[in-house]
Amino acid sequence: VEVTIASKTTTSANIRQRYWWVSGMHKLDALTRILEVETFDAMIIFARTKAATEELAEKLQARGLAAAAINGDMQQAQRERTIGQLKEGKLDILVATDVAARGLDVERISHVLNYDIPYDTESYVHRIGRTGRAGRKGEAILFVTPRERGMLGAIERATRQKIEQM
């Protein structure tokens, strides 16, 4: 009998991973461009802080997009309501922190966008694992600022996968 344990840094083969070099000031413009050109059913956008999730969700709503924030400051019932709206198609974009999105399983999620690069490689794997589930194809996009170049390399080494540049 042979028992193998999957590494915590394994990513699904169903997920196409891409990155985009972007300076901090131009992230919102880059996001707007992606939302214009990518065909998506539902998307999770990961931001590093609770405040950033709220701010980004408000900016997307101001552009007429069905977006909402989800973070650790929200009551559990409110988080569940927001996730329910995503499942039902009333929302198309969820802007989340890592903690708020742990274990999130919504079939509609076709895209995961890392607006802020995660602090560690394991978080990256957890984030992009919200798409490409149950045999479906998924898209993972990572924004990388010039000083985050090293983290991009660390993610590629940990996942043993080259992430293609957009």
Protein language model annotation of sequence segments:
Residues 1-166:
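Conserved helicase RecA-like core
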